[in-house]
């Protein structure tokens, strides 16, 4: 179901065990604190992993370290989360309302669906929302998905 070369995000406001089990036979990692998660991923035998709200409580620098480690270990991921900010780090996004698939597509396509995301209670990631607002004032003519890139553009 999931391509081993693509990182996915599943936005779901209340995934239960049945939902997670339907995803497939990919190993699920959940409820690990940062150091234990790093330790587990360093010797992870599989090429794919499912995070079930695992990244939600991590600080941004910890998430970046996890993503760097995953890339180094050549492990792709499916991140099941209720945090729309985590969608920024995925290539492909599925958005669910209960057990109903509402949106699906690459990151740019899904994050353009502002009204639908807000209706479902997600809103937009901060950097995306800010860059859209700056577009209204003709400061930019594109949407940014990376805060560092947005800051560099503001300084130029």
Where are these predicted regions, by residue range?
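Conserved beta-strand-loop-alpha-helix hinge in the C-terminal portion
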Residues: 100-128
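Conserved catalytic segment of ABC-fold P-loop ATPases
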Residues: 88-95
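ABC ATPase nucleotide-binding domains
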Residues: 8-11, 117-156
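Glycine-rich P-loop/Walker A and Walker A-like loops and their local beta1-loop-alpha1 context
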Residues: 2-26
């Amino acid at each position: 179901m999931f391509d081993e070369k693509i990182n996915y995000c599943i936005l779901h406001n209340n995934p239960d065990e049945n939902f997670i089990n339907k995803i497939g036979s990919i190993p699920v990692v959940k409820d690990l604190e940062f150091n234990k998660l790093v330790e587990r991923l360093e010797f992870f035998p599989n090429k794919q992993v499912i995070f079930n709200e695992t990244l939600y409580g991590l600080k941004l620098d910890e998430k970046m370290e996890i993503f760097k480690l995953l890339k180094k270990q050549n492990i792709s991921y499916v991140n099941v989360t209720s945090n729309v900010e985590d969608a920024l780090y995925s290539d492909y996004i599925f958005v669910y309302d209960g057990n109903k698939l509402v949106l699906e597509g690459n990151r740019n396509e899904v994050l353009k669906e502002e009204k639908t995301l807000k209706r479902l209670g997600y809103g937009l990631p901060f950097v995306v929302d800010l860059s859209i607002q700056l577009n209204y004032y003709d400061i930019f003519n594109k949407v940014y998905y990376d805060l560092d890139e947005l800051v560099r553009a503001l300084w130029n």
